[in-house]
C-alpha cells in the first residue's frame, strides 16, 4: 500500500511517499525569511501554497508513482503555525477527494519519533525530541508516549534561533551559533533553570543577549549558550534513564544534527548502559516521509478519517495522542 504524506507545520513544505512501511522518497522546500528574520505564519503559508504543486509533481515523477496508486493521504495536523498547517490540510483533502481515499491526521511530534525509530531500528527507547518547536523527553507507556520532562516555554531550537537572529548570525540559528562557538576557548556562567523534570529556555537567549551587550566576545557567549542548553537537557535525560532503566535512547528532531549535543547525550547513555541512537540527518528536520510513515502505521490500525472530518490543531500535546501501532513495531519488549 502507498501512503502520501504532507508536512507543512512551520517553515518547511515537504511531501513523502511510503510503500508497505518502507520510505520510497521525499522532497521539500524551506521558507527562508527575508533578512534572516523570524517566520511569519502567513508568508510561510504563501510559500507552501506556491511550491506544493511542483513538489508533488516532481516527487511522483522521480518515484515513478501515479496519483492513482496512492491508497491514503496523511498530513501533519499539528501542532504548528495555523496558516501553514492549513495549506497541508487543504492539499491532503483535495487529493483524498479526487482519489476517493481516506485522510490520516498525524501529530508532528509523534511523526518525528516514528521516523527516528524506523531509521535507527530502536525498539522501546527513551525519546529525546528536540527541534525548533519541541523539547520533550518521553517514553512509551499504556498506549501513548508519556512525557518525563519538557520545556515550560520555548523549545531549545527556538531559543537558539532567537539569539542567532538578534546577533545577526542568520537562520537556521543552531548550526550558526555552534560554528561561532568553535573559536571560543572559555565559557561564562549561565543560569540553568531546571524545574523538577522540566526546562525553561526563554531566559537563556535573553541572558546571552545581555552578555553580548556588556561586551563579552560573541564566540564565548555562543559556546556558553549551547553548552548550558545541552547540559540542561542532558540532566533531564539522565534522570529519566535512572527512572526508566531503558537501554536505548533515540534522539529525534532537527536539533539532533548537532555534533556537540550528540557527544553529550552519548556520554550520558554510556554512564547508564544505554545505547544512544540519533536520527539520520535526512530525517532530522521536518519532512514528508515521517508524515507518510506515521500515516501508514495509523491507517493500518484504523486511525483515519474522511476529508470532511479532517482538521488542524495548532496546539496538540504529544501525550494526548494514542499510538496503537507501537507494539506492532516492537512486539517483544518491556513497557514502563
From Swiss-Prot:
MF GO annotations: iron ion binding; N(6)-L-threonylcarbamoyladenine synthase activity
One Gene Ontology cellular component: cytoplasm
Pfam families: TsaD
Residues that, per the record, bind Fe cation: 108, 112, 286
Entry-linked Gene3D superfamilies: 3.30.420.40
EC annotation from Swiss-Prot or TrEMBL: 2.3.1.234
Free-text comment on the cofactor: Binds 1 Fe(2+) ion per subunit.
Compartments, record wording: Cytoplasm
Cofactors (names): Fe(2+)
Gene Ontology terms describing biological process: tRNA threonylcarbamoyladenosine modification
Protein residues bound to substrate: 129-133, 161, 178, 258
Catalytic reactions of this protein: L-threonylcarbamoyladenylate + adenosine(37) in tRNA = N(6)-L-threonylcarbamoyladenosine(37) in tRNA + AMP + H(+)
Record keywords, A-Z: Acyltransferase, Cytoplasm, Iron, Metal-binding, Transferase, tRNA processing
Top-level class of the enzyme under EC nomenclature: transferase
Domain of life: Archaea
NCBIfam families assigned to the protein according to its UniProt record, in alphabetical order: arch_KAE1, gcp_kae1
Function: Required for the formation of a threonylcarbamoyl group on adenosine at position 37 (t(6)A37) in tRNAs that read codons beginning with adenine. Is probably involved in the transfer of the threonylcarbamoyl moiety of threonylcarbamoyl-AMP (TC-AMP) to the N6 group of A37.
Family per record: Belongs to the KAE1 / TsaD family.
Name of the protein in its database record: tRNA N6-adenosine threonylcarbamoyltransferase
Protein source organism: Pyrobaculum neutrophilum (strain DSM 2338 / JCM 9278 / NBRC 100436 / V24Sta)
Amino acid at each position: 500500500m502507498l501512503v502520501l504524506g504532507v508536512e507543512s507545520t512551520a517553515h518547511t513544505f515537504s511531501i513523502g511517499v511510503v510503500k508497505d512501511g518502507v520510505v520510497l522518497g521525499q522532497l521539500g522546500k524551506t521558507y527562508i525569511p527575508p533578512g534572516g528574520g523570524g517566520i511569519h505564519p502567513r508568508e510561510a503559508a504563501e510559500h507552501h501554497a506556491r511550491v506544493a504543486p511542483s513538489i508533488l509533481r516532481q516527487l511522483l515523477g522521480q518515484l515513478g508513482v501515479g496519483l492513482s496508486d496512492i491508497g491514503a493521504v496523511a498530513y501533519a495536523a499539528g501542532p504548528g503555525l495555523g496558516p501553514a498547517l492549513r495549506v497541508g490540510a487543504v492539499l491532503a483533502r483535495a487529493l483524498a477527494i479526487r482519489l476517493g481515499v481516506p485522510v490520516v491526521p498525524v501529530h508532528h511530534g509523534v511523526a518525528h519519533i516514528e521516523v527516528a525509530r524506523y531509521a535507527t531500528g530502536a525498539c522501546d527507547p527513551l525519546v529525546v525530541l528536540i527541534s525548533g518547536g519541541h523539547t520533550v523527553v518521553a517514553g512509551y507507556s499504556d498506549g501513548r508516549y508519556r512525557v518525563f520532562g519538557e520545556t515550560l516555554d520555548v523549545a531549545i531550537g527556538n531559543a537558539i534561533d532567537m539569539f542567532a537572529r538578534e546577533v545577526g548570525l542568520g537562520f537556521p540559528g543552531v548550526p550558526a551559533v555552534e560554528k561561532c562557538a568553535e573559536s571560543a576557548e572559555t565559557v561564562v556562567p549561565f543560569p540553568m533553570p531546571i524545574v523538577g523534570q522540566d526546562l525553561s529556555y526563554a531566559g537563556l537567549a535573553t541572558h546571552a543577549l545581555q552578555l553580548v551587550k556588556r561586551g563579552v566576545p560573541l564566540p564565548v557567549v555562543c559556546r556558553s549558550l549551547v553548552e548550558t542548553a545541552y547540559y540542561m537537557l542532558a540532566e533531564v535525560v539522565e534522570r529519566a534513564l535512572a527512572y526508566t532503566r531503558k537501554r536505548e535512547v533515540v534522539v529525534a528532531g532537527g536539533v539532533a544534527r548537532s555534533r556537540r549535543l550528540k557527544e553529550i547525550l552519548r556520554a550520558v547513555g554510556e554512564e547508564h548502559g544505554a545505547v544512544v541512537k540519533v536520527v539520520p540527518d535526512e530525517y532530522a528536520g521536518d519532512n514528508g516521509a515521517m508524515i507518510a510513515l506515521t500515516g501508514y502505521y495509523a491507517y493500518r490500525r484504523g486511525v483515519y478519517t474522511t476529508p470532511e472530518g479532517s482538521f488542524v490543531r495548532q496546539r496538540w500535546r504529544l501525550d494526548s495522542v494514542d499510538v496503537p501501532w507501537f507494539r506492532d513495531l516492537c512486539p517483544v519488549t518491556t513497557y514502563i
